[in-house]
């Protein structure tokens, strides 16, 4: 059995709202996949904080397709996935799942590939597996690389690795009891705020990814109608706050995590805290 892990993260630029560019930064929240070859069988389970879930065969087949494009071909897989954070809430869990499966298959077959190539291979198959709307190259790259990224999700290109900043900040994340699976996503509320996402993308490409995250987060909060909560997080000292990804999770980046946690707990959210993964 081979194993590999990939990280969850936060949105820098929401590619659903922008329409082309995306950005993400990895957190110290992990998904670990353990795989073995099982000819003719595509089966697995994902163990999450919200219980055990069956992995759809299409997800395992997509991971195998991506790995085979890098020279690691299998005719079937059994997998056990351990997810250390709630899935389906905008914390890049789907990308971390697929990326970790691809990396695990590469290790199973003894094939070495740079993380950026594994991320690209995973992103190319993610839409067909029902794991993303845009291909989510930003999320897959952030899950495997040790730096924040800006990507062209339509052109499938990593445009920029960003400075590894943010180590004085804690990500305080409010997770509601409901999920927002990809198959139920309505992109139109996000696309109504495309000008804000354009501004976030310009900031990100200039290397100013923390301000970009702030702009994108507020745009997401407007899209989902939680701008009042984002405002309260700023009042509590957040450097950036809003909705991450497709939501419904709400985040604050702050040097005062207790204050942000109290705001989120008062609003009825479960609180998860993490730091950027390059910060140790």
UniProtKB/Swiss-Prot annotation:
It comes from the Archaea. This is Shikimate kinase. The keyword Cytoplasm applies. Its EC number is 2.7.1.71. GO terms for cellular component: cytoplasm. It catalyses: shikimate + ATP = 3-phosphoshikimate + ADP + H(+). GO terms for biological process: amino acid biosynthetic process; aromatic amino acid family biosynthetic process; chorismate biosynthetic process. It comes from Aeropyrum pernix (strain ATCC 700893 / DSM 11879 / JCM 9820 / NBRC 100138 / K1). Gene3D superfamilies: 3.30.230.10. The lineage of its organism: Archaea, Thermoproteota, Thermoprotei, Desulfurococcales, Desulfurococcaceae. The gene is aroK. Its main location: cytoplasm. PANTHER family: HOMOSERINE KINASE, HOMOSERINE/4-DIPHOSPHOCYTIDYL-2-C-METHYL-D-ERYTHRITOL KINASE. Keywords: Amino-acid biosynthesis, Aromatic amino acid biosynthesis, ATP-binding, Cytoplasm, Kinase, Nucleotide-binding, Transferase. It is found in: Cytoplasm. InterPro entries: GHMP_kinase_C_dom, GHMP_kinase_N_dom, Ribosomal_Su5_D2-typ_SF, Ribsml_uS5_D2-typ_fold_subgr, SK_arc.
């Amino acid at each position: 059995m081979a194993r590999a892990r990939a990280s969850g993260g936060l949105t820098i630029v929401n590619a659903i709202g922008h329409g082309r560019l995306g950005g993400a930064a990895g957190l110290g929240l992990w998904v670990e996949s353990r795989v073995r070859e099982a000819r003719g069988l595509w089966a697995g389970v994902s163990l999450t904080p919200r219980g055990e879930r069956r992995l759809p065969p299409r997800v395992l087949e997509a991971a195998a397709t991506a790995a085979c494009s890098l020279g690691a071909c299998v005719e079937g897989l059994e997998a056990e996935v351990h997810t250390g954070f709630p899935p389906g809430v905008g914390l890049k869990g789907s990308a971390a799942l697929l990326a970790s499966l691809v990396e695990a298959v590469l290790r199973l077959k003894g094939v070495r590939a740079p993380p950026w190539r594994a991320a690209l291979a995973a992103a190319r198959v993610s839409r067909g597996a029902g794991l993303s709307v845009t291909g989510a190259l930003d999320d897959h790259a952030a899950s495997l690389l040790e730096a924040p990224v800006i990507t062209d999700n339509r052109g499938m290109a990593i445009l920029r690795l960003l400075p590894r900043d943010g180590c004085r900040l804690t990500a305080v994340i409010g997770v509601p009891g409901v999920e927002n699976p990809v198959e139920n996503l309505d992109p139109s509320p996000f696309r109504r705020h495309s000008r804000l996402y354009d501004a976030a993308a310009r900031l990100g490409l200039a290397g100013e990814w923390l301000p970009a995250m702030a702009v994108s987060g507020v745009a997401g909060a407007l899209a989902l109608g939680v701008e009042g909560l984002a405002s309260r997080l700023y009042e509590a000292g957040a450097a950036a706050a809003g909705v991450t990804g497709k939501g419904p999770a709400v985040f604050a980046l702050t040097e005062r995590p207790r204050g942000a946690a109290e705001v989120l707990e008062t609003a009825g959210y479960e609180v998860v805290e993490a730091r950027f993964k390059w910060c140790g």
